[in-house]
């Protein structure tokens, strides 16, 4: 005699609890969980939907970013499900937002493919950000275990080797993005590069959206740029470079452009964040194998990193990109035109440069993390900065940084070379003051005025941009301390 539906369900329920049950009761919430050194840890900012318990929301995030689906499935019994389930183990209210919670989640290391940013992110940020139980969700920080970090190559070149290749130590490197970013012919583009490097800069660079457009094809740009680099290097006696953007529609085309850049003598190539994690790792491997510095422009990152309650904090992107193997990444200026709270930006720079991270809640660093001897990634500051801010830039960002003055070089009324010279003289005056033990931050304006007495281009720059400041309150600020904008 055929069994009824009710009888079949009763028999199945003897073997396992079926149906839809709360995530917290399925094992995805465990306040007594003891974190292992090998666990992948993630810190999410969770805004539950009205009426959803924060514990259940935390468990839902853990479940949907690991093994769960919307209902219990019997095939769980074919796995080590107790091991593979992510465990939300701590929920703290956000001090500045009563409807938000910091959720700590631990993942077993076996859930992730070795050496793959793509696989790591497919779990951690894959489906869960569209989950209905949460109103908003942001990945604030991660602790990548030592053993997992060892499966990544890290930066292709690193800060120390880059400085040795350039023979430039003890100061920030100086750069400039060619402006206008679109519309120049190859020959005019190369002229901008030559003028900037001859005036004292270390690098010129392509902007994120210069690839191979009708007004300037990539091969022409590379040839004219390298002519400018070589002439400026010969005239100055310094090693110079210009970031050649190899971003393209396919990996085959990226390789073609990178190989040509190497053939014409470039020391550095550039890619955009929008090419994707797998492509970034692939180009980092190529760069290491070919002794090339790899610059990453974070094009597109603010679409998901800027809003405080939803998306991915840039410190997490910084960790992923250091693992992936980029040598440079834009990481904020504090004083420029782009988003940048001083304390939060300091956390980004520490993430890229320190060999080991300590917990620093004001900076947004929630976990200790040893970088497992991966090389440092050099932060890049660009966007609305000029020579008159040099004391602030050195104070907030330190010396391991590339300071890129685009408009602050090319917008100089006496020309590109004069703009470059103004920046170089301002930097060297400030570094000298620092080395002499002076309070260069508070004395900065006077130090610059004194240097300008012997440098007409610097005086012109100070006169032109003296009143320029971008005093907007940052969108992404610390949850634990109040910080004013840097220029106030």
Curated annotation (Swiss-Prot):
Keywords: Calvin cycle, Carbon dioxide fixation, Chloroplast, Lyase, Magnesium, Metal-binding, Monooxygenase, Oxidoreductase, Photorespiration, Photosynthesis, Plastid. GO terms for cellular component: chloroplast. Heterohexadecamer of 8 large chains and 8 small chains. Coiled coil: none annotated. PANTHER family: RIBULOSE BISPHOSPHATE CARBOXYLASE, RIBULOSE BISPHOSPHATE CARBOXYLASE LARGE CHAIN. It is found in: Plastid, Chloroplast. Its EC number is 4.1.1.39. Belongs to the RuBisCO large chain family. Type I subfamily. NCBIfam families: PRK04208.1. It comes from Cyanidioschyzon merolae (strain NIES-3377 / 10D). The gene is rbcL. This is Ribulose bisphosphate carboxylase large chain. Pfam families: RuBisCO_large, RuBisCO_large_N.
């Amino acid at each position: 005699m055929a069994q009824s539906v009710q009888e079949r369900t009763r028999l199945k329920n003897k073997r396992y609890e079926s149906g839809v049950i709360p995530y917290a009761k399925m094992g995805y919430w465990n306040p007594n969980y003891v974190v292992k050194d090998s666990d992948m840890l993630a810190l999410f900012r969770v805004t539950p939907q009205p009426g959803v318990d924060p514990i259940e929301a935390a468990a839902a995030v853990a479940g949907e970013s690991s093994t769960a689906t919307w209902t219990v499935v019997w095939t769980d019994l074919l796995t080590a499900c107790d091991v593979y389930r992510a465990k939300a183990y701590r929920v703290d209210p956000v001090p500045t937002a009563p409807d938000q919670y910091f959720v700590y989640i631990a993942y077993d290391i076996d859930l992730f493919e070795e050496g793959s940013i793509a696989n790591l992110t497919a779990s951690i940020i894959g489906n869960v950000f569209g989950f209905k139980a949460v109103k908003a969700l942001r990945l604030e920080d991660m602790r990548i275990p030592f053993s997992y970090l060892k499966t990544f190559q890290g930066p292709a070149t690193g800060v120390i080797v880059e400085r040795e290749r350039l023979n430039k130590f003890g100061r920030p490197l100086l750069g400039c993005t060619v402006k206008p970013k679109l519309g120049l012919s190859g020959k005019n583009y190369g002229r901008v590069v030559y003028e900037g490097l001859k005036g004292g800069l270390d690098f010129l660079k392509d902007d994120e959206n210069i690839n191979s457009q009708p007004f300037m094809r990539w091969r022409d740009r590379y040839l004219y740029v390298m002519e400018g680099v070589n002439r400026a290097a010969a005239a100055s006696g310094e090693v110079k470079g210009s970031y050649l953007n190899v971003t393209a529609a396919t990996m085959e085309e990226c390789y073609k452009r990178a190989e040509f850049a190497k053939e014409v003598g470039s020391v550095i190539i550039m890619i955009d964040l929008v090419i994707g994690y797998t492509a970034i790792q692939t180009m980092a491997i190529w760069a290491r194998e070919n002794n090339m510095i790899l610059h990453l422009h974070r094009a597109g990152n603010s679409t998901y990193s800027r809003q405080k309650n939803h998306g991915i904090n840039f410190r997490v992107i910084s960790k992923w990109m250091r693992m992936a193997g980029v040598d440079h990444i834009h990481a904020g200026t504090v004083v420029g035109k782009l988003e940048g709270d001083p304390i939060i930006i300091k956390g980004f720079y520490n993430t890229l440069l320190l060999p080991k991270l300590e917990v620093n809640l004001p900076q947004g660093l929630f976990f200790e993390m040893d970088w497992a001897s991966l090389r440092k990634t050099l932060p890049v500051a660009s966007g609305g900065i000029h020579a008159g801010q040099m004391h602030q830039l050195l104070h907030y960002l330190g010396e391991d940084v590339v300071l890129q003055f685009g408009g602050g070089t090319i917008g100089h009324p006496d020309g590109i070379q004069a703009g470059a010279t103004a920046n170089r003289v301002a930097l060297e005056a400030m570094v000298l003051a620092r080395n002499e033990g002076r309070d260069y931050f508070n004395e900065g304006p006077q130090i610059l005025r004194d240097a300008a007495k012997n440098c007409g281009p610097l005086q012109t720059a100070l006169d032109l941009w003296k009143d320029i400041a971008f005093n907007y309150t940052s969108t992404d600020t610390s949850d634990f301390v109040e910080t004013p904008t840097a220029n106030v």
